[in-house]
């Protein structure tokens, strides 16, 4: 027998003494749900007793091909017997049965992703015991039919719609509108119907444990078998599609496994003094300090999140007849939990005939807006300190605050309203299924997923959609919780929308308007409204709580007490981006890609320079480019007055500025067919020959970067002259321009040395011409492994290093980014060959090259500064490594990633202090 403990108890014994064996620190052992059930038990909250099967058991079971580890089943049987003794009831007992729930619980919160079974232990005998115990036949038969339905779907994979259709038919026959109006006799008949559905749709060969009658499997009668199959199903659900999608989205390892929680049932469906609900200690949408959530009278827990019936607000619980005392106790529990966890808590509870039971708590998911407000107010309340507040905000979540909103200056009329379930606005075409959402999105269409209510199988469509709209469900429904977690705008509970997914239409109560697939609508998840047609959207502004958190973050990241500050710059190619980045808190420009200034109308000018044989034409093109580029730099440097602006010389191969040769070939053929003159055709053919002559077989490793400065020096030197001239003129105007020139794609020290000599000569010429002393640093962009290896040599001749981690990743791996991401990186990640996409999160080997180059450069030239301007400069995970492992001075990212980078840089500083 294994020495590994696989089962942990929680709750009290028959005498009320706590026998809990775990606590909240054990989430990797017991899963988040199990650890928090143990913690609530330890602090004296009312928790139904139970036991937790460890995550490691799931890992070993799955890893062995769904074979139980040695001794595991024996421990589970012993835990069952212990729970029966504690509760004074027995599973399957015909007089006073113990019923249990079986729930998953991963180490990290995965709301709605995993499967649950309630009322396990019911069979034809124990249902009679439940009737005798409760004197409530309707409740007993309702519990039994729910169990068969859940067990058949979750454990055996029977289509849930088969049961819903039978339930609908039962309502029609009985002449009632809702399930709660069905009689005990109706429900007893439904139990037999559900058993028949089970027998007709379960393959006996797949489940040799099941009894077979007339070739059909019989619904399992033995509670021991029910429990074992349910636990195995929860283990199996860890690798189902929707769980894998969620983990991939949130960076959760597939190798953690899930725990299983077996817990005595508390019934919220025992009549009008019973209820079930989901609540938060604060508002998870905006952070308001108020009790927030939904409850349903005479219902079971899954009814709330499934959105089957519209819920009541938690504030009404204290005034609901028969539930007043439980409502008051729940508010006291809210305060206890928040004080204990020092965070907003998400709670599931059941009230059984006036008695409150806590079924779950966890640190609650929240919108970015709510996260900021809660963190700030908890600092003000003395629950946490500023550093902890900064550490609690997920940098990636700040993207939510930058989501578009409806343009307030434009008029629009709401077609319908619902609940403001997840903030932000979205515009898109109506689609009615997850598959259609994915298909249309892949074709380049923006879509709004419109559903009666979502379920976990809709996740891929929710990910693909710009926004989500449901006609049912509350603010804690599946749609609301998942949308908030993804930062996707969502409006729930739009009751005027009567959705017919089969016909793909929405009929709107009180309106003649009928929405069909492909119609465009706009939704505002902040206001909870739906608008017919497209509404203009505007970007959100950084104000209020975000400014407060980011100001705290800046204080932390710019602190030089324990080393250099963690600076944040921006990649900006025009004054508009630069100005926006300053609003977002960028300190300087870390990368200005000058080639972007040659696009649009200016493309013809650079094409004249590249393709012409006439030296006069080439020089005129250079003069024209010098003029427009000088104007660009004047605007850029003026915007960034007093701040560094790193200007990268021309980097891409020249053919990127030319026409596509194959498209030009087609155009020539068409002109020939149309009878164009030989003179016109000759010009085009000459152009095609020149372009073909410039095509390289591997252009990204060809004539580009510093190699252009060596082979075709006129173009990059024109850029140096433009930058120096702009700086000189601004100095004379009293502006403080601070340009820095960066030489790209250097791999050989002599490349940089020779290019720097020419750059300095041009700067000196401009200084004399303009009568202004210029001091423009010249640095190197390290994008190749060889450059990192000889960084100490290059550092003798460079004022700074900036790492282009996009190309450094390509050349370290030997990957072509576009090809790799399109063709095999997703497969590599699926097969766990790669943990992350190395173009999104910096690879350890690439990070080591950066670290080594920084170390070499700093040893040679202690006054150098070091930065990163690749995509990794905006990735929170990469930012921590770049500062704490590679020891760079700054990261540079796109304007909209600047707030995220500021926060991540502060968190990197805090992490470094903790590990010092």
Task: Indicate where each model-derived feature is located.
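Nucleotide/phosphate-binding sheet-loop regions of phosphoryl- and nucleotidyl-transfer enzymes
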Residues: 1-413, 439, 445-448, 455-460, ...
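Short, ordered loop/turn segments at secondary-structure junctions
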Residues: 52, 56-58, 454, 473-475, ...
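Conserved alpha/beta-domain cores
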Residues: 103-104, 542, 554-916
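Short, compositionally biased
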Residues: 382, 531-551
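Short alpha-helix capping/helix-loop boundary micro-motifs
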Residues: 336, 504-511
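Intrinsically disordered, low-complexity regulatory segments
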Residues: 435, 495-497, 547-553, 573-575
């Amino acid at each position: 027998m294994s020495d590994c403990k696989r089962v942990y108890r929680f709750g009290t014994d028959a005498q009320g003494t706590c026998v809990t064996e775990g606590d909240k620190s054990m989430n990797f052992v017991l899963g988040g749900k199990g650890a928090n059930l143990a913690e609530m038990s330890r602090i004296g909250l009312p928790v139904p007793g139970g036991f937790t099967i460890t995550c490691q058991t799931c890992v070993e079971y799955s890893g062995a091909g769904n074979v139980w580890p040695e001794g595991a089943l024996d421990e589970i049987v012993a835990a069952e017997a212990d729970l029966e003794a504690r509760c004074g009831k027995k599973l399957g007992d015909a007089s006073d049965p113990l019923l249990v729930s079986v729930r998953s619980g991963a180490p990290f919160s995965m709301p709605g992703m995993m499967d649950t079974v309630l009322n396990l232990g019911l069979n034809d005998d124990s249902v009679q015991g439940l009737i005798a115990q409760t004197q409530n036949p309707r409740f007993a038969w309702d519990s039994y039919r729910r169990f068969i339905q859940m067990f058949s779907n979750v454990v055996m994979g029977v289509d849930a719609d088969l049961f819903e259709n039978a339930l609908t038919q039962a309502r029609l026959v009985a002449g009632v509108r809702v399930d709660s109006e069905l009689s005990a006799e109706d429900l007893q008949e439904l139990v037999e119907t559900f058993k028949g559905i089970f027998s007709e749709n379960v393959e006996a060969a797949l489940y040799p444990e099941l009894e077979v009658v007339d070739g059909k499997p019989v619904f399992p009668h033995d509670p021991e078998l029910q429990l074992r199959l349910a636990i195995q199903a929860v283990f199996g659900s860890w690798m189902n599609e929707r769980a894998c999608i969620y983990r991939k989205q949130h960076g959760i390892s597939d190798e953690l496994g899930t725990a299983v929680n077996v817990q005595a049932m508390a019934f919220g469906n025992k009549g009008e003094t019973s209820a079930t609900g989901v609540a938060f200690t604060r508002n998870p949408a905006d952070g308001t300090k108020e009790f927030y959530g939904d409850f349903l009278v005479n219902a079971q827990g899954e009814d709330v999140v499934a959105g089957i019936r519209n819920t009541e607000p938690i504030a009404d619980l204290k005034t609901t007849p028969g539930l007043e005392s439980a409502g008051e106790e729940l508010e006291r529990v809210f305060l206890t939990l928040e004080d204990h966890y020092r965070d907003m808590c998400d709670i599931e509870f059941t009230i059984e005939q006036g008695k409150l039971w806590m079924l779950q708590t966890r640190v609650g998911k929240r919108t970015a807006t709510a996260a900021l407000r809660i963190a700030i107010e908890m600092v003000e309340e003395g629950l946490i300190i500023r550093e902890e507040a900064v550490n609690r905000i997920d940098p990636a979540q700040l993207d939510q605050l930058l989501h578009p909103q409806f343009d307030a200056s434009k008029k629009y009329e709401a077609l319908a309203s619902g609940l403001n379930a997840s903030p932000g606005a979205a515009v898109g075409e109506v689609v009615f299924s997850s598959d259609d959402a994915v298909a249309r999105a892949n074709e380049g269409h923006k879509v709004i997923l419109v559903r009666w209510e979502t379920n976990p199988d809709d996740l891929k469509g929710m990910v693909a959609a710009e926004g989500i709209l449901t006609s049912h469900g509350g603010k804690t429904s599946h749609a609301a919780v998942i949308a908030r977690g993804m930062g996707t705008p969502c409006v729930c509970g739009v009751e005027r929308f009567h959705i017919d997914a089969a016909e793909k239409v929405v009929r709107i109560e009180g309106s003649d308007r009928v929405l069909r697939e492909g119609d465009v609508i706009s939704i505002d998840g902040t206001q909870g409204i739906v608008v017919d047609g497209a509404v203009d959207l505007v970007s959100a502004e950084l104000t209020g709580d975000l400014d407060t958190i980011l100001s705290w973050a800046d204080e932390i990241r710019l602190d030089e007490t324990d080393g250099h500050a963690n600076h944040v710059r921006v990649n900006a190619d025009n004054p508009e981006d630069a100005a926006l980045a300053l609003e977002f808190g960028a300190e300087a420009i870390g990368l200005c890609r000058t080639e972007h200034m040659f696009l649009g109308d200016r493309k013809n000018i650079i094409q004249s320079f590249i393709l012409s044989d006439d030296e006069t034409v080439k020089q005129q093109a250079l003069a024209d480019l010098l003029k427009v580029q000088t104007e660009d730099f004047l605007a850029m440097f003026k915007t960034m007055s007093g701040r560094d602006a790193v200007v990268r010389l021309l980097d891409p191969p020249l053919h990127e500025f030319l026409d596509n040769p194959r498209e030009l070939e087609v155009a020539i053929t068409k002109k020939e067919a149309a009878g164009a003159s030989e003179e016109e055709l000759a010009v085009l053919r000459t152009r095609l020959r020149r372009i073909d002559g410039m095509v390289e077989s591997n252009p990204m490793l060809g004539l580009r970067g510093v190699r252009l400065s060596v082979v075709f020096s006129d173009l990059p030197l024109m850029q140096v002259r433009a930058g120096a001239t702009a700086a000189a003129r601004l100095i004379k105007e009293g502006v403080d321009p601070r340009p820095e020139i960066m030489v790209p794609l250097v791999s050989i020290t002599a490349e940089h040395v020779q290019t720097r000599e020419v750059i300095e000569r041009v700067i000196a010429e401009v200084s004399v011409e303009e009568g202004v002393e210029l001091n423009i640093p010249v640095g190197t962009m390290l994008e190749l492994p060889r450059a990192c290896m000889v960084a100490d040599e290059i550092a003798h001749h460079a004022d700074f290093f900036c790492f282009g981690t996009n190309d450094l990743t390509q050349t370290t791996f030997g990957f072509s980014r576009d090809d790799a991401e399109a063709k095999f990186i997703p497969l590599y990640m699926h097969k766990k060959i790669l943990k992350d996409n190395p173009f999104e999160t910096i690879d350890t080997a690439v990070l080591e090259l950066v670290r080594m180059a920084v170390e070499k450069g700093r040893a040679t030239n202690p006054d150098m500064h070091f930065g990163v301007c690749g995509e990794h400069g905006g990735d929170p995970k990469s930012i921590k490594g770049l500062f704490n492992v590679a020891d760079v001075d700054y990261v540079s990212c796109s304007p909209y990633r600047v707030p995220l980078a500021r926060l991540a840089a502060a968190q990197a500083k805090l992490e470094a202090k903790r590990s010092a």
